[in-house]
A protein has these predicted regions:
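A structural micro-motif
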Residues: 13, 54-56, 77, 104, ...
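Helix-to-loop junction immediately C-terminal to a conserved catalytic motif
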Residues: 4-36
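Hydrophobic alpha-helical segments of integral membrane proteins
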Residues: 4-8, 73, 162
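A conditional alpha-helix N-cap/helix-loop micro-motif detector
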Residues: 13, 63, 86-90, 122-123
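Non-catalytic C-terminal accessory region of glycerolipid acyltransferases
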Residues: 90-248
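Short, basic, glycine/proline-bearing loop/turn elements
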Residues: 5, 76-83, 112-116
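Catalytic core of membrane glycerolipid acyltransferases/transacylases, capturing the structured
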Residues: 24-86
Length: 248
């Protein structure tokens, strides 16, 4: 699967990876917190992680793991699912913490979905990752991505037939011709040492630090595109405004 993913990403665009992981964190409980800009950015993140000798697992919406064929592949690859509103959410969190302490790097998207901010800056997100970090003692490495949005349209809310797949296929084929830069930056670990699990307000404070670190790493990746992406995706709805958007 790793070889197939690397080949797919290499066909899709030009992978550019910056930053690295401190050697003393290898094998330690590690959370990778990334912005979410495209249906393809998980594949880009996997390929980038292999460049720095990491093999992370993703925390995904539980429904994905129940999709025929796709779900089986994801489960066999070690990815984890969580249904936030279901009774198994606590058990899923236990599995995540166990994987972290077994030395498995875990990727979580704090936003929980592809950003719909008009400028494609990170959305507000939720505190789940921050709570896991504080509760498990895991280190948090912010990951910033840019360019994968040019490789695949946002597409449709639901796919009920082959016509619904056309936006994904046509945008990807254009990407193969255009070869956009697929940029991934691994930032410095976020310092959460003064915060405590269960202390009122600390999960929110941790979340804010993580999101600001992701955004800080994103700024140089999208130099020349500070307001809105130069690439226009006609299928992506835009709502709200990112609270993390740089003001200067």
């Amino acid at each position: 699967m790793v070889t197939l993913n690397r080949g797919f990403v290499g066909l899709t665009g030009r992978l550019e990876v910056t930053g690295n992981l401190p050697e003393d964190l290898r094998g330690a409980p590690l959370l990778l917190a990334s912005n979410h800009i495209s249906n393809l950015d998980p594949m880009t993140l996997v390929a980038a992680s292999r460049r720095i000798d990491l093999a992370p697992r993703f925390v995904l919406a539980g429904g994905l793991l129940r999709v025929p064929v796709v779900g089986r592949v994801l489960r066999s690859s070690g990815h984890l699912g969580v249904d936030r509103e279901s009774a198994n959410a606590t058990a899923a969190m236990t599995d995540i913490v166990a994987a972290l302490h077994a030395g498995v790097p875990i990727v979580i998207y704090p936003e929980g979905k592809i950003s719909l901010d008009p400028g494609l800056w990170p959305e507000r997100g939720k505190t789940g990752l921050a709570r896991i970090a504080l509760g498990s003692g895991a280190h948090v490495v912010p990951v910033s991505q840019w360019g994968a949005h040019e490789a695949c349209y946002w597409g449709n809310l639901k796919v009920t037939g082959w016509r619904d797949l056309l936006p994904y296929l046509t945008s990807w084929l254009r990407s193969v011709r255009r070869r956009p830069a697929l940029k991934v930056h691994f930032g410095d670990p976020v310092d959460l040492s003064d915060l405590r699990d269960g202390r009122p307000g600390d999960a929110r404070r941790a979340h804010e630090r993580i999101m600001r670190a992701i955004t800080a790493g994103l700024v140089p990746l999208r130099a020349g595109e500070p307001d809105v992406p130069a690439f226009h995706d006609p299928t992506r709805p835009t709502t709200g405004s990112s609270p993390w958007r740089p003001t200067a």
